[in-house]
Amino acid sequence: MRPASGVHNVQATMQVNWRGVFPAIVTQFRQDQSLDPDATAKHLETLIQAGIHGVVLLGTVGENTALEYGEKLALLKEMVPVVHGRVPVLTGVAEYTTALGCRFARDAEKIGIDGLMVLPAMVYKSDQRETIAHFRSVARATGLPVMVYNNPVSYSVDVTPEMFVELADEPALVAIKESSENVRRITDLVNLLGDRYILFCGVDDLVLESILLGAHGWISGLVNAFPEESRALWDLAASGCWEQARALYRWYTPLLHLDTRIKLVQYIKLAMAETGLGSEMVRAPRLPLVGAERQEVLGVIRHAIATRPAVGQTIVFRGLPTVERP
């Protein structure tokens, strides 16, 4: 482990191999808004077969805060055997108090989850001291490796690079999902902390920029609807095939913008329905899209489907040479 110059509180961390494309998987519901574990398991298997490198259950896109505590655990119990150790499985930890976050982390550990993606406590907007104390407490609650999810846009709490320096003495904190929409954060984190943390891009329409700057992985919402294209984009960029990566990214970006809007869950599930990979059913207070908004989003999705490149062992773009997959 290589800390940056001047950083003295870095400790040896747990060793994990978290790299590549990790979908923030949706939670599927029936028409009555009850959990549909069978449909969720089917979708999870589809993503694994498409070549994803890991999976995050019960994140923002997984509608974590719309599920009851027992429902979350029930879903984890159903999904862990589906994965059967083929890829790492993380769960979101998004609770209203630190104590409840610690409890959920311990319960998830008993189920056999591989790691935790921990958010700040919900609703209350903690200050820096409180936020650091929250992450320390949850990190010490289990023997699992932890990814810190920084999303000030959605949750109004910003975990700054300087705060990650302070947290660097917690060996369980191994990774960061950076969703501040400030791509400069990748470089700032590397400059301050070297390779202390595994860095994941958490903003779909910043992924190519983040890979160029040193991100090790991508936690994506749109991969739920376009898994093959997401894996191809990662492979091209990680292998330095920048011309082809740019071409794929330019096709994909109008879709990826959907991940950055307030109704991202509805947009992603609508894209899944259009690609035949799942239901658009969400749980209230979210409602399926209607009217002009629905037509606008469908226009983006359907144009992308009509113009999507052929992605397989070779990738075929309009107007560019065919390229072999790395």
Locations of the language-model features?
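A general structural signal for well-ordered alpha-helical segments in protein cores
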Residues: 18, 40, 72, 76, ...
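Active-site beta->alpha loop and helix N-cap motifs at the rims of alpha/beta catalytic domains
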Residues: 11-23, 28-156
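Short, amphipathic alpha-helical "lid/cap" segments that border enzyme active or binding sites
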Residues: 37, 41-44, 161, 294-301
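Structured C-terminal cap/extension of enzyme domains
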Residues: 208-321, 326
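Catalytic cores of TIM-barrel enzymes
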Residues: 13-17, 188, 197, 272
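Alpha-helical structural signal in soluble globular domains
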Residues: 50, 74, 78-83, 107, ...
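Catalytic alpha/beta core domains of metabolic enzymes, predominantly
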Residues: 140, 152-262
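N-terminal amphipathic/basic-hydrophobic helices that include classical n-h-c signal peptides
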Residues: 1-11, 321-326
